């Protein structure tokens, strides 16, 4: 499916994008990475609210342990996720950069699935999604549900819904199955 998506993105980029941003410029990378991160937030929030998408995402949240193995619990299909990034080639981001930016986003999110890192220095906690933010996202306690959907940056959580600090540490897992 990724190859087909790459072909689709290439067609959108080639025939529909009003301009093409240069891949050798730093600002294109910033736009690509932040764009993927914003659209990841949109998709991730949707995945928690739309029953069909939650059915593919719930395995990631079902572990009662918050560790690197939890990070590897990924869906086998894209459940429409690939459609979320269509605006990026339309904005002139080269398709290969969209995929690489998504890979960077996913690799970043791997390390935040751990209990071994506590709260970090306050400026880091403010700018980046950290294990303490993501612990809240995986929490099954009522006060932690539906929080902190960000990938790399928690800014979207600050803008679109209040972030929560884990006090005390939340129990992880899921309280629901196919119901979002």
Report the location of each language-model feature.
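Charged, amphipathic alpha-helical linkers/stalks
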Residues: 179-180
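Juxtamembrane/interfacial segments at transmembrane-helix boundaries in multi-pass membrane proteins
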Residues: 6-30
């Amino acid at each position: 499916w990724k190859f087909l998506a790459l072909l689709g993105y290439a067609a959108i980029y080639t025939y529909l994008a009003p301009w093409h941003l240069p891949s050798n410029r730093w600002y294109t990378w910033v736009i690509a990475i932040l764009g993927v991160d914003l659209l990841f937030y949109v998709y991730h929030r949707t995945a928690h609210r739309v029953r069909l998408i939650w059915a593919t995402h719930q395995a990631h949240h079902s572990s009662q342990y918050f560790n690197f193995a939890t990070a590897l619990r990924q869906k086998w299909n894209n459940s429409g996720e690939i459609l979320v990034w269509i605006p990026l080639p339309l904005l002139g981001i080269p398709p290969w950069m969209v995929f690489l930016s998504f890979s960077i986003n996913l690799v970043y999110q791997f390390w935040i699935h751990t209990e071994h890192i506590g709260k970090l220095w306050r400026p880091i906690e403010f700018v980046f999604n950290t294990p303490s933010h993501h612990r809240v996202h995986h929490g099954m306690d009522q006060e932690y549900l539906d929080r902190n959907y960000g990938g790399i940056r928690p800014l979207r959580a600050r803008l679109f819904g209040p972030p929560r600090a884990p006090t005390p540490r939340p129990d992880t897992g899921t309280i629901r199955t196919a119901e979002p």
